[in-house]
Amino acid sequence: IGPAQTQAAAPLPASPPIDHGPVDPGRSQGAEELFQPPARGTAPNDPMGDAIRRGEAIFVGTYSHPESARYVGNTQTCEGCHLDAGRLAGAAPMWAAWVAYPAFRTKDHRINSIVERIQGCFTYSMNAPASAVGHAPEADSATLVALQSYIYWLATGAPTGDTRMPGRGYPALDPTPQGFD
């Protein structure tokens, strides 16, 4: 393969979940005062719980999951940017995103809902224009409803409207001796 050619990457397995132990939702673990999402496996056994579990499966296997694969034009997953299935503080956790939207985004100079933000992830990070259907999932699609259900559940006990929750986003990096590229 020449430098101007590309080869499709082989699908990668979803990463195994990390067990953070028994921590009640909304309670701090340690001295950092970081929000804790509900423990894995504690979603209710009802239709909402089914949607939460589907949402988590889509989140960790976005490019290969039957409900979401047609919207993904590469081998990216939500978990590729939002580590530990969107649970990990300091790695763009989804519990912090849920309580911070709607929000103004400088990228498109308007107020975005959480649905529009997720659609943006499909469009830009997962290359939806190159996907089988050529666009991000519709707002009322099974894919987005399941993802929203999962993200909503992760934010159980989070203070709504807190756009500065500790652990939100990524940590600031110190400049290296060589600087940044």
Where are these regions (language model features)?
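Catalytic and substrate-binding regions of cell-wall glycan-acting enzymes that process beta-1,4-linked
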Residues: 97-103
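Short alpha-helix boundary/capping elements
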Residues: 82-89, 126, 155
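The canonical Cys-X-X-Cys-His
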Residues: 55, 75-86, 147, 181
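Local sequence-structure signature of Cys/Sec-based thiol-disulfide redox active-site neighborhoods
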Residues: 61-76
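Short cysteine/histidine-rich zinc-coordinating motifs and their immediately flanking basic loops
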Residues: 90-96
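Post-cleavage N-terminal segment of exported redox proteins
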Residues: 1-64, 103-181
